[in-house]
């Protein structure tokens, strides 16, 4: 049995907080196990002067970490699941999905400010085509401005007055202890979140049976079922950073409820919701994707 595991992660404050959560869970599940952390710089960390969708759409924050796993430098990787491509390389697997945090988007602005109350022309920062598309549909009078950098950098730019408001993932703010910065939690029926938002995705080599066994206790069934449906939806559409796509699933007893959206950059979009058996999340994800593609999503993707 392995006595030491090495986790690979990006070096941002949020990535490290999430990695330490996984490290602590591993050591709690396996007393005596030593877990080390290696920082890895990805292409998405280096290129900060262009919007994400202008760089490329496959694994911007993932590829270099996977290469370190293949080389044997690390045993597993911790990601924000929303950064993972919809289909992993055949030699990699999503080995564990710990319990999901708040999947909603959060408005960060003056205390008490809401999305509905933002004044016309307000400058709203976001790096996400998904958020921008839905915001344009909801509030075409807002001025949307690209926003890059880690959470601290984004908050600093807001304080400096470069933006009137910014939209970030609530889970990241909460994990960093920045709940107080949130002026409004935006419900999923207003802004459908990114696929996997709020989930920590633990990736490992598909053939590393010992690491997979060690990670098994960290997997949360509800998170696994939900993200499987969401990722099936995304894979069916073929979406990445260059396509405004969102999906959120949650369990209601034995049923799984899945919301999804496909959009265009100008704010046109199709949205929908389906229920299905929790025993077939892939089928539900594909069914909703097919429905939205047939209802106009295919034309939106074609431009």
Curated annotation (Swiss-Prot):
PROSITE patterns assigned to the protein according to its UniProt record, in alphabetical order: PORPHOBILINOGEN_DEAM (PS00533)
Residue list for modification S-(dipyrrolylmethanemethyl)cysteine: 241
Gene3D superfamilies per record: Periplasmic binding protein-like II (3.40.190.10), Porphobilinogen deaminase, C-terminal domain (3.30.160.40)
Top enzyme category: transferase
GO molecular-function terms, A-Z: hydroxymethylbilane synthase activity
Note on cofactor: Binds 1 dipyrromethane group covalently.
BP GO annotations: chlorophyll biosynthetic process; protoporphyrinogen IX biosynthetic process
UniProt xrefs under CDD domains: PBP2_EcHMBS_like
Cofactor(s), by name: dipyrromethane
A Gene Ontology cellular-component term: cytoplasm
The protein's Enzyme Commission number: 2.5.1.61
Pathway where this protein functions: Porphyrin-containing compound metabolism; protoporphyrin-IX biosynthesis; coproporphyrinogen-III from 5-aminolevulinate: step 2/4; Porphyrin-containing compound metabolism; chlorophyll biosynthesis
Family statement drawn from the similarity comment of this UniProt entry: Belongs to the HMBS family.
Note: The porphobilinogen subunits are added to the dipyrromethane group.
Role played: Tetrapolymerization of the monopyrrole PBG into the hydroxymethylbilane pre-uroporphyrinogen in several discrete steps.
Quaternary structure and partners: Monomer.
Record's protein name: Porphobilinogen deaminase
Organism: Roseiflexus sp. (strain RS-1)
């Amino acid at each position: 049995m392995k006595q030491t595991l090495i986790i690979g992660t990006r070096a941002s404050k949020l990535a490290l907080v999430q990695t330490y959560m996984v490290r602590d869970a591993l050591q709690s599940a396996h007393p005596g196990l030593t877990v080390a952390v290696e920082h890895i710089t990805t292409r998405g960390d280096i290129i900060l002067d262009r919007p994400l969708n202008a760089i490329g759409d496959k694994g911007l924050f993932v590829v270099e970490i996977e290469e370190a796993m293949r080389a044997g430098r690390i045993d597993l990787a911790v990601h924000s699941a929303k950064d993972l491509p919809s289909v992993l390389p055949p030699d990699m697997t999503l080995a564990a999905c710990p319990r999901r945090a708040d999947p909603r988007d959060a408005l960060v602005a003056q205390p008490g400010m809401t999305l509905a109350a933002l004044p016309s022309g307000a400058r709203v920062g976001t790096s996400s085509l998904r958020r921008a598309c839905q915001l344009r549909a909801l509030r075409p009078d807002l001025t949307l401005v690209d926003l890059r950098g880690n959470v601290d950098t984004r908050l600093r730019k807001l304080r400096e007055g470069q933006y009137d408001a910014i939209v970030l993932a609530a889970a990241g703010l909460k994990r960093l202890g920045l709940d107080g910065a949130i002026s409004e939690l935006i419900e999923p029926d207003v802004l459908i979140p990114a696929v996997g938002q709020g989930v920590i995705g633990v990736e490992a080599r598909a053939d590393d049976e010992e690491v997979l066994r060690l990670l098994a206790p960290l997997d949360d069934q509800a998170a696994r079922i939900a993200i499987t449906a969401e990722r099936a939806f995304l894979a069916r559409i073929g979406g990445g950073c260059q396509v405004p796509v969102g999906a959120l699933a949650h369990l209601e007893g034995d049923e799984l409820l899945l919301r999804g959206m496909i959009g265009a950059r100008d704010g046109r979009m199709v949205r929908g919701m389906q229920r299905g058996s929790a025993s077939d999340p892939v089928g539900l994800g594909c069914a909703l994707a097919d429905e939205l593609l047939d209802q106009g999503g295919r034309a939106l993707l074609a431009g």
